Regions:
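Alpha-helical transmembrane segments in inner-membrane proteins
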Residues: 1-232
């Protein structure tokens, strides 16, 4: 947002977005270091609560900063900033950035699959996974870091497109089961398909106007989220 307000190009916007994700991750590590850097051990519900509440507070801080940037931005750039907040694939056509994103996707997927076995055990509970030899805290730190990197890259290219990371894994698990060796690559591909489908609908349903991608994914994601909450 700050890069857009300053009139920066696509590469600078991507770098600012990725840098913001890494800064938020670093802040999470600093504020919740006792929970994230604790020694491996049995499940600790208080540790989970600390990480969750710290993440909520960081999200609130980021929302406040975004509000300030929007209120101080020039009028001519407000539309671009709003579209970026709601998701815009305009930056994804930048070939150098797109190529780097594909390379990053391959590397991140390989890193995630490395922990697929541990994730399968964690589905049965952290205590059970720990008793079977999974270094739960180290796996947690590694996966949080990978998630932050992947989120930073995605936001750098497409803006703040929400609910894709929630909808795609649930649909994949519904059809193919919970084996993370299958879920991780399938969910990443399905997520990309959902975003492209939402972008295509947004560009065609009200042409020549363009509907924001994030709004369309939210219209799909919110009902699925509520449906999941109501399941026994």
């Amino acid at each position: 947002m700050l890069a857009i307000a300053l009139g920066a190009g696509a590469v600078a916007i991507a770098l600012f977005a990725a840098g913001g994700a890494f800064a938020a991750l670093l802040l999470l590590f600093l504020l919740a270091h006792r929970a994230l850097f604790a020694r491996d051990g049995p499940v600790d519900q208080g540790r989970d609560g600390t990480i969750l509440l710290t993440g909520v507070m960081i999200a609130s801080l980021c929302a406040a900063v975004l509000s300030l940037v929007l209120s101080l931005a020039p009028d001519g750039r407000l539309r671009t900033m709003i579209f970026w907040l709601l998701g815009d694939l305009g930056g994804a056509v930048n070939l150098p950035l797109g190529g780097l994103a594909v390379l990053a996707w391959v590397l991140l997927l390989a890193a995630g699959l490395r922990d697929a076995g541990a994730l399968n055990l964690l589905l049965g509970g952290e205590l059970q996974a720990y008793t079977q030899g999974v270094p739960t805290v180290r796996v947690r730190r590694r996966l949080i870091s990978l998630t932050a990197v992947a989120t930073g890259i995605a936001v750098a290219l497409a803006g703040a497109v929400g609910f894709v990371g929630f909808v795609a894994p649930h649909l994949v698990r519904y059809f193919v089961g919970a084996n993370q060796r299958v879920v991780l690559p399938a969910a990443s591909l399905l997520g990309a398909i959902l975003v492209l489908l939402a972008d295509t609908i947004g560009r065609s349903v009200a042409a020549p106007l363009q509907l924001p991608v994030g709004a369309l994914t939210a219209l799909v994601g919110v009902p699925i989220f509520l449906w999941q909450l109501q399941r026994p």
